[in-house]
Each structure stands twice: as structure tokens, then as C-alpha cells.
From Swiss-Prot:
Gene: acnA
InterPro entries reported in the protein's UniProt record: AcnA_IRP_Swivel (IPR044137), Acnase/IPM_dHydase_lsu_aba_1/3 (IPR015931), Acoase/IPM_deHydtase_lsu_aba (IPR001030), Aconitase/3IPM_dehydase_swvl (IPR015928), Aconitase/IRP2 (IPR006249), Aconitase_4Fe-4S_BS (IPR018136), Aconitase_4Fe-4S_dom (IPR036008), AconitaseA/IPMdHydase_ssu_swvl (IPR000573)
Protein name as catalogued: Aconitate hydratase A
Subunit-level organization: Monomer.
Enzyme Commission number, as recorded: 4.2.1.3, 4.2.1.99
């Protein structure tokens, strides 16, 4: 065992003749008179973490104080057991680590001190696109295209695997990181050097929360925070409020786990749970499998919570057995949980900040859309919902039902037609009940003579190879294939915007007539412009409903009451729960999990054949458009003085719910964008632009892509969509990138104003890195989403909120104002009040109060050093 803290609380736990040391949280709680059974289970995990990680008695008393008011403003240090990454966020993180080694060398330190101290698993899942679909060889073609496009990135990751300790890469074509984590990587109870403790993690993807369904505490963080955690830095956090959700009853009728999570998302987003833990409890747990729970936990970012936690119970053990975990590990989980009061007790209810109740029997079949995951719509209201939303897309009522011919085809399309139907995302493909349900519905549809409409692009991209194995074993895969839901890849695909191109004739018809067409997907996000640039409307739903909408080909139908085919209704082809359960019982077993995960780190022949150079520091290629040495450390060693921001210009003014997709898009690179110009200047053809997400290892592309989402709306440019602003130095409309570069060249700082929920969505650290490289010094908003706020701080950008009832609208800003932010100094504290002086061109001046949204002393240190990366490197140098 390495460092030993609070040794008086260490005791022995024997499991199958193996002795483990554990930190006795019952004794520690008793010593400070903390009634442990009243504490939420998620906080019990944190209590053990603080105890084990050198927490003083004062640190532990924070939990006792929490029980008095069910909230706290006290800080704790969280030390996760491990880190999970995917390639879109993982590549820039490893680029940062490589750059840190160079920086360490530059200031006279040892580059090898930059090494992960805890296990880091990176799963390559974000790069495969749906180029080929509805064909037997679609999977092979898409894999080949993926390798061709991403060979340089993959060589870099393979280099990282040999250069850094504790760093493993799961090669492409294996699965989605969260499903791989759920089915294989997660241990529930970790053990190292003879010490057993709760498994926990942070991940560079916001849906890291999925594993809370398996009772593993974890959440998404920005890449820069993850890097700090890897290098042994604690994640300082405020002990959160915990919202308890009491579940009763069970799902009935045709309601699925997807319908349940959309209901939970709607309910909790209204409750405003940002920055809070959510914990599920109650008799209803007995009616939810781990797969159901994981679906609910997966969408924690969509309902705004840090995590959605389920305590350990018998379902946890059943799932570990089903997925082929070692018997000794399963026994350790069961014994440890019972010994430490982490096993769910149905007889004793923990105490929560607030309790909400949800009767599972009240959940209805539904979709969510057309542009936010919290906007749930009952299935029989979808058509009306879409028509109600059409004016918001600029479509007049008289044009709603118009149809337009598609060139060289014998069909027409119109507003509301579904052009993408994708069974995608770990949210749902990890759940056998909805996957088997989709396959059974496909079977029955074919038996009734139904076919997918010819304008619908269909795809199946599960999160693990186990899914295709049980579909094959059940004999149901052929029905999905026949409807066009052939395997296209094992990765995120459509859910993250890698939906690939539509039929060119369909694209032409959409563009020519300004159609609002739709995608229906089993994903977790449907933000504007995310799924495909041409599908302005996107609806989330279960895989079963994805198949149903592919058959109908339109949103303009009440599937509950209108026929899909001639005298054929959805109820005629919907599989019963008994049918689904029978297939699951006969087709899913532990041996398939063991087999499919036995060589998870091996990869394909193409992966094995990738050539790399063995070295401890990376040999940067200055001509690369994928991997570049970032400029963050050019001023390493110099002091970053915190001082007032004077004579700043407004770079942009945004409304509510600006997502990290808006700030730093992951999808395709528009041919007219600044990033496209950079790539073209570097002799890259448009066909090879790839996506923003794939080029996150190159800061030149990413800073040009910042605020370049084609659907973003800057209120300074009325009636204009896309990444534009008014450059106040020239009084001209320019791209945000070009204006920012002009301001930087003239030493003019810039700020951003925004509404509520700024930075919601993905854990995208480039949504903070990009603005920092554009010269943004502060973001002033009504509220921030949790991960993005910490990312801004990590990059040295000040997050500030209005006080009272002030908003950007009350201030009547037009973007021509000059901004001073007064009250910033080396003595700033968390939640520091500051003054904002707004000077209009007329000479009128107004001063308002702002609150600095910096929560901890550690975050103050990050600002003082210029960024969390500077802080870590300079601390490690010693």
C-alpha cells in the first residue's frame, strides 16, 4: 500500500481467503457522531474518499454539518480512482500532456513527472461516421474510411500509450466508452496494493455519469480537470445538495426505459438540479434493471445534475454476474457494500435536500424535441408539437403541408418528413429490452408487409459487440437488416453528429425549398445543428420508436391512433413485454460478454499495423493539421497578475441555453468557415476536412471553429445565423474569429454576455480553450452549466453572473459598448462581488454588480497561474 492516512480507521476484510484493508467508515462516522445511515449513499462514497485521501477530522465534520441543513458551502477534495476518456476529448488531453512535458523541460523540470498516477482508459468511439448504410458491408466500409481519415490521430494515441504510464487505449471499432465502462471496465469496488475502496471516476465526456447506474460514482469534467486528476491533483468541490427521487410502481403498457429517462429529464430540468447530486431510491428500484438505471444515469447532463446515483443492491450483483465479472470480484463487492453500509437498505430511508416522487406506472410513450432533450412530448402529441414549432423555424402555416419532388426519385418530401432514423448511442443500445424490442418490431413490420420509406437514412450503431452478438443469436438481426438497419459501426455516430451525408438529391430538395426535415434517434441530445446540418428538427426516442418512425417516414402522424400502413397500426406490431423478456432470457449470457471483452485492447489488423516512434516526448510535425503543439505554455513561468479588465469590447451577446455545441461544434466543417480557409490554405481538400471533433488536437482549427456553429445566433447581428459579430474597431460584420484576431492584434480585451444555462451540453473543454485563444477575459451570464463553468476557470476565463433581476436584455446592450470590470485583484475570494461599468457610445455610463462564479480557493489559484495546466506544471516542478 502506498501512502497511509488515518490509519486508525483501517481494518481487515476477508473475502474467499483473501484479506483486504478497508477504511472503516462506520467507525469514522461514529467517532464524529455522524449517523451514517441518514447520509445519502452517494455522500457515503464521498465520505470514504475523503477519509482515505488524508481527510482531517474537520474535513469529515463537513458531512455531519451537511445533515443539519442538507446543503453546504464547505469544500472537499475528491480523488477519483480512475479516469475515462473518449478520442474527441482524449486527443486534446494527451496533446496537453505532451505539451506539459515540453513545458516542464523548458522550465528545468523532469518531463517524466508528467505521468498519470491513476488508471486512464481511452476508448476510441467518436470518429466513425455513417458514410455507408443499409448494406451488408456498411460496417467494413465505414471502418476503412475511419482509419483513412484518422490515421494521424490514432498514431498519436498509440504513441501516448507507450509514452505514458497507466494509460490504455481501446482501439476503434470496439464500442462506446460508457457502455464499455458499464459492461467491462467498472469494478464497483476497486482494489490496489491490498486496499479495497469504492470504484469512482471522472471522465472527459459528460455522459460518464452512465456508470452511476451500476453504483459507481462518477461524472464528466473538462479535459483540463481530468489532466489534473491524472497527475494527482484533487478535484476540489463543494459538498453538493442531494435531491432524492423516490421511485414507486413499475413501467406499464408500452412504456420503456427511454420513456422513463425522458420523463425524468423533463421533471428534473424543471427542478433546476445543476450542480447537485440526484439519488434514486424507493420500492421502484426493484422493478428497474441495471440497464434501465444506466439509461437514467446516462442522461444526468441533460437534466443538469452532476450525477444520478443508484445504490448497490441485488440488481448490481446480478448485472456483474451477467456481464462475466470474476466471481471473487463480485463477492468483494457484496461483502464490502454490506460491511460499509453501502448496500441499499429498503427499511431505512436516507435524508435528502429535497425529495421528489415518481410513479413509474405514470410514464407514457414519448419523444423529446425538436431541439432540447428536456422537451418531452407524449407520442400522440408529436405531430401537433412539430406543427406548433414550425413557425419558430421560419415556416408559415400555409407551407406546412407542401410536398416537393426529389430529383430522379419517384417520391416527394416535405416539412416534418423523417430523413434520418438512427438506432444509436450508449444511452439505449446498452439496454437489451429496447434493442430486442426494436428487432421484434422490425420482424412484425415485415410480416405485415411494411417497409421503411425510401427517403429515410437508417443505421444501427450499438455501443458494444455484445449487442450484435445477442441479436445474431436470437435470429432477429436479419429483420433489422432487411429494413435497412444494418450495422454501420461500434461508436457514437449519429448521436454526436457523425450522421454522414444524406442522398444528394434529398439534400438538394431540402436546401432549395428550405424544408424543416427531421431526425429521430435513440440518442441523448438533439441540440440545433448537432445531428445533421440539414435536420433542423431532431427528436429523441427509444430504438423501438426509431424503427416505427422509419416506417412512417414522417412526424406528421399520431402513431397511437393513425395507421402506419394500410389498416396496420403501431399497436399491431408492438412487441409485448413477455416476448421481449423471453428473447432476453434465451439470447443473452455471460459467456458472450467474456468472449467479446477478452481482447478489448488488441484492435484490428489496421490498428496493429500503425507505425509509431518510441519516445518520451512527442516529435511535433509543424505541418500537421491534426496534431499541433498548443500555445498555452509559451508564457510558462511568468506571473499572471489578476487585475481589472479595462476598455473591453463585447465579442458576442447570446441568449439562453447556449450549448458547448454552439461554442465549439463537433460536427462537419462548413466550406465557408475560417477553419475551412485554414485547411484549404494547408492544401486539404473539402472532402478530407473531417470534423471539428477529429481536429481537436490542432488549436489552429479549433480556435477558428469557436462560435462557428451554423445555428448560433449572436444578438449583435440581427437576423443572422452563424458565427458572426460586429467588429467595433471597423464597424463591419465579420466572423467572430476574424474580429477576435483584430482585437488581439490591437491589445483589446473582449468579453461575452449571455442568458441562462450558458455552456450546457457536452463536457467540451475546447468550449473554454477556444474562447481563451480568442482573447476572451470574462463571460457574463445569468447562469452557467456546471462543467463549462469549471472549464472556463481552468483556462483562466472569469465566469460572472448578474445580481438581482439584471439580464443582458434589461441592459439593452447592442454590442457597441465598452466594458470595465472593477474589483479584480490578487486578493479575490470565491464568490467575490465586482463592479461592471458599461459605457455606451452616447457617453452614457451604467454600473452594475456582478458575482464571480469561482467556488474554491484552488480555483483562485488556477486563475492566478493563468490556467490549471500552468498550476499543475509549476507545482510538479517543485
Amino acid at each position: 500500500m502506498s501512502k497511509v492516512h488515518n490509519s486508525e480507521y483501517i481494518k481487515e476484510l476477508s473475502v474467499d481467503n483473501t484479506s483486504y484493508k478497508i477504511y472503516d467508515i462506520n467507525k469514522a462516522a461514529s467517532d464524529i457522531e455522524l449517523p451514517l445511515k441518514k447520509l445519502p449513499y452517494s455522500l457515503r462514497v464521498l465520505f470514504e474518499n475523503v477519509l482515505r485521501s488524508n481527510g482531517s477530522k474537520q474535513n469529515l465534520l463537513v458531512f455531519k454539518e451537511w445533515l443539519k441543513t442538507k446543503e453546504s458551502d464547505a469544500e472537499i477534495d475528491f480523488m477519483p480512482a480512475r479516469v475515462l476518456m473518449q478520442d474527441f476529448t482524449g486527443v486534446p488531453a494527451i496533446v496537453d500532456l505532451a505539451a506539459m512535458r515540453d513545458a516542464m523541460k523548458k522550465i528545468g523540470g523532469d518531463p517524466l513527472k508528467i505521468n498519470p498516477l491513476i488508471p486512464v482508459d481511452l476508448v476510441i468511439d467518436h470518429s466513425v461516421s455513417v458514410d455507408s448504410y443499409a448494406a451488408k458491408d456498411s460496417f467494413d466500409k465505414n471502418v476503412q474510411m475511419e482509419m483513412k481519415r484518422n490515421i494521424e490521430r490514432y498514431q498519436f494515441l498509440k504513441w501516448g500509450q507507450q509514452a505514458f504510464n497507466n494509460f490504455k487505449v481501446v482501439p476503434p471499432g470496439t464500442g462506446i466508452c460508457h457502455q464499455v465502462n458499464l459492461e467491462y471496465l467498472a469494478k464497483v469496488v476497486w482494489h490496489k496494493d491490498g486496499l479495497a475502496y469504492p470504484d469512482s471516476l471522472v471522465g472527459t465526456d459528460s455522459h460518464t455519469t452512465m456508470v452511476n447506474g451500476l453504483s459507481v460514482l462518477g461524472w464528466g469534467v473538462g479535459g483540463i480537470e481530468a489532466e489534473a486528476a491524472m497527475l494527482g491533483q484533487p478535484l476540489t468541490m463543494i459538498l453538493p445538495e442531494v435531491i432524492g427521487v423516490k421511485l414507486t410502481g413499475k413501467l406499464t403498457g408500452i412504456a420503456t426505459a427511454t420513456d422513463l429517462v425522458l420523463t425524468v429529464t423533463e421533471m428534473l430540468r424543471k427542478k433546476k438540479v445543476v450542480g447537485k447530486f440526484v439519488e434514486f431510491f424507493g420500492e421502484g428500484l426493484k422493478n428497474l434493471t441495471i440497464a434501465d438505471r444506466a439509461t437514467i444515469s446516462n442522461m444526468s447532463p441533460e437534466y443538469g445534475a452532476t450525477c444520478g446515483f443508484f445504490p448497490i443492491d441485488q440488481e448490481t450483483i446480478k448485472y456483474l454476474e451477467l456481464t462475466g465479472r470474476e466471481k471473487t470480484q463480485i463477492k468483494l463487492v457484496e461483502k464490502y457494500a454490506n460491511e460499509q453500509n453501502l448496500w441499499y437498505d429498503f427499511e431505512h430511508e436516507a435524508e435528502y435536500t429535497e425529495i421528489l416522487e415518481l410513479d413509474l406506472s405514470m410514464v407514457h410513450s414519448s419523444l423529446a424535441g425538436p431541439r432540447r432533450p428536456q422537451d418531452r412530448v407524449d407520442l400522440n402529441d408529436v405531430a401537433n408539437n412539430f406543427k406548433h414549432e414550425l413557425p419558430n423555424f421560419g415556416i408559415e402555416n400555409k407551407d406546412i403541408d407542401k410536398k416537393y419532388a426529389v430529383a430522379n426519385q419517384n417520391y416527394e418530401i416535405g416539412n416534418g418528413d423523417v430523413v434520418i432514423a438512427a438506432i444509436t448511442s450508449c444511452t439505449n443500445t446498452s439496454n437489451p429490452s429496447v434493442m430486442i424490442g426494436a428487432a421484434l418490431l422490425a420482424k412484425k413490420a415485415l410480416e405485415h408487409g411494411l417497409k421503411v420509406k425510401p427517403w429515410v437514412k437508417t443505421s444501427l450503431a450499438p455501443g458494444s459487440k455484445v449487442v450484435t452478438e445477442y441479436l445474431k443469436l436470437s435470429g432477429l438481426d436479419k429483420y433489422l437488416d432487411e429494413l435497412g438497419f444494418n450495422l454501420v459501426g461500434y461508436g457514437c455516430t449519429t448521436c454526436i453528429g457523425n450522421s454522414g451525408p444524406l442522398n444528394p438529391e434529398i439534400e438538394e430538395t431540402i436546401n432549395k425549398n428550405g424544408l424543416v426535415v427531421a431526425s429521430v434517434l435513440s440518442g441523448n441530445r438533439n441540440f440545433e445543428g448537432r445531428i445533421n446540418p440539414l435536420t433542423k428538427a431532431s427528436y429523441l426516442g427509444s430504438p423501438i420508436l426509431v424503427v416505427a418512425y422509419a416506417l412512417s417516414g414522417t412526424l406528421n402522424i399520431d402513431l397511437n391512433n393513425q395507421p402506419i400502413g394500410k389498416n396496420i397500426y403501431l399497436k399491431d406490431i408492438w412487441p409485448s413485454k413477455e416476448e421481449i423478456d423471453e428473447v432476453i432470457a434465451n439470447s443473452i449470457n455471460s459467456s458472450m460478454f467474456i468472449e467479446k471483452y477478452s481482447d478489448i485492447f488488441s484492435g484490428t489488423k489496421e490498428w496493429k499495423d500503425l507505425q509509431i516512434t518510441t519516445s518520451s516526448t512527442y516529435n511535433w510535425n509543424k505541418n500537421s493539421t491534426y496534431i499541433n503543439n498548443p500555445p498555452y505554455f509559451e508564457d510558462i513561468g511568468s506571473k499572471n497578475n489578476i487585475k481589472d479588465i479595462k476598455s473591453a469590447k463585447i465579442l458576442a451577446i447570446f441568449g439562453d441555453s447556449i450549448t458547448t455545441d454552439h461554442i465549439s461544434p463537433a460536427g462537419s466543417i462548413s466550406k465557408t468557415s475560417p477553419a475551412a480557409k485554414y485547411l484549404t490554405d494547408n492544401h486539404i481538400e473539402p472532402l478530407d476536412f473531417n470534423s471539428y471533433g477529429s481536429r481537436r488536437g490542432n488549436h489552429e482549427v479549433m480556435m477558428r471553429g469557436t462560435f462557428a456553429n451554423i445555428r448560433i445566433k449572436n444578438e449583435m447581428c440581427k437576423g443572422v445565423e452563424g458565427g458572426f459579430t460586429i467588429n467595433q474597431l471597423s464597424s463591419t460584420q465579420q466572423t467572430i474569429y476574424d474580429a477576435a484576431m483584430d482585437y488581439k492584434a490591437n491589445d483589446v480585451p473582449v468579453v461575452i454576455f449571455a442568458g441562462k444555462e450558458y455552456g450546457s451540453g457536452s463536457s467540451r473543454d475546447w468550449a473554454a480553450k477556444g474562447p481563451q485563444l480568442l482573447g476572451v477575459k470574462a463571460v457574463i451570464a445569468e447562469s452557467f452549466e456546471r462543467i463549462h463553468r469549471s472549464n472556463l476557470v481552468g483556462m483562466g476565463i472569469l465566469p460572472l453572473t448578474f445580481t438581482g433581476n439584471n439580464t443582458r436584455l434589461d441592459l439593452k446592450l447592442d454590442g457597441s459598448e465598452t466594458i470595465d470590470i472593477i474589483g479584480l485583484s490578487e486578493q479575490i475570494k470565491p464568490y467575490n462581488p465586482v463592479k461592471c461599468m458599461i459605457k455606451k457610445q452616447t457617453g452614457e455610463t451604467r454600473t452594475i454588480d456582478l458575482i464571480l462564479q469561482i467556488f474554491t480557493d484552488n480555483e483562485i489559484n488556477y486563475i492566478k497561474h493563468g490556467s490549471i495546466m500552468h498550476f499543475v506544471v509549476e507545482n510538479l516542478k517543485g
